[in-house]
Design a protein with these regions (language model features):
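Catalytic tyrosine of NAD(P)H-dependent dehydrogenase/reductases that use a Tyr as the general acid/base
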Residues: 2-5, 58
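Active-site helix of classical SDR
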Residues: 8
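NAD(P)-dependent short-chain dehydrogenase/reductase
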Residues: 14-61, 67-75
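Short aromatic/basic micro-patch
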Residues: 25, 61-63, 95, 117, ...
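Substrate-binding strand-loop-helix patch
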Residues: 34-35, 59-70, 90-108, 157
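Mid/C-terminal beta-alpha module of Rossmann-like enzyme folds, strongest
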Residues: 79-126, 166-167
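A hydrophobic C-terminal alpha-helical subdomain
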Residues: 122-143
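Amphipathic terminal alpha-helices
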Residues: 151-167
Length: 167
């Protein structure tokens, strides 16, 4: 882990594992939904109200729609797959940059904002962010026999849901 946030999350995972109890820990990335505070909602608002915005283009990852993660957890419970234990990575399929994600949000929302790519150095944040944070999801797919939605498909669903909520 790059910073305190990542290290403390890892320490928490290690403490749960050391307890000896069965556990399922899901690591995810770029989590978004139609509620709360997240990149999706920020971009939906900014692209609706600004003619141009800058978005980081040199960090790669995979957006995760909270609905998809909740669906996985519900599936595990309903199918009684609770005999497994461990840490699992879960995010949407595919890879994109924040710039790509923002551009797709802008497009799906029907907004005309001009999105300009920039480097991480041009957009300082309190915590250092990795340039590549794509998760290996082979274990979760294998152990639970699932297919993971492509991030663009999940985004399209999220936008439809968002539009229905704001009407």
């Amino acid at each position: 882990p790059l910073g305190v946030y990542g290290r403390t999350k890892l320490e928490g995972e290690n403490a749960v594992a050391a307890s000896g109890c069965r556990h399922l820990i899901f690591r995810t990335s770029w989590l978004y939904s139609n509620t709360g505070k997240n990149f999706f909602l920020t971009m939906a608002d900014l692209t609706a109200s600004k003619p141009e915005i800058k978005v980081v283009a040199d960090q790669a990852g995979t957006p995760t729609y909270a609905y998809d993660l909740a669906y996985l957890i519900t599936y595990i419970i309903e199918e009684n797959l609770l005999d497994r234990s461990g840490v699992y990575n879960y995010s949407g399929e595919g890879v994109c940059s924040w710039f790509d994600f923002a551009s797709e949000i802008n497009s799906h929302m029907g907004h005309t904002c001009r999105i300009v790519p920039c480097r991480s150095e041009e957009y300082p944040t309190p915590a250092e962010r990795p340039h590549y944070s794509v998760l290996d999801k082979s274990k979760v797919k294998r152990d639970f026999g699932i297919e993971i939605p492509y991030w663009r498909h999940s985004l399209a669903m999220a936008v439809q849901e968002y539009i229905s909520l704001i009407k």
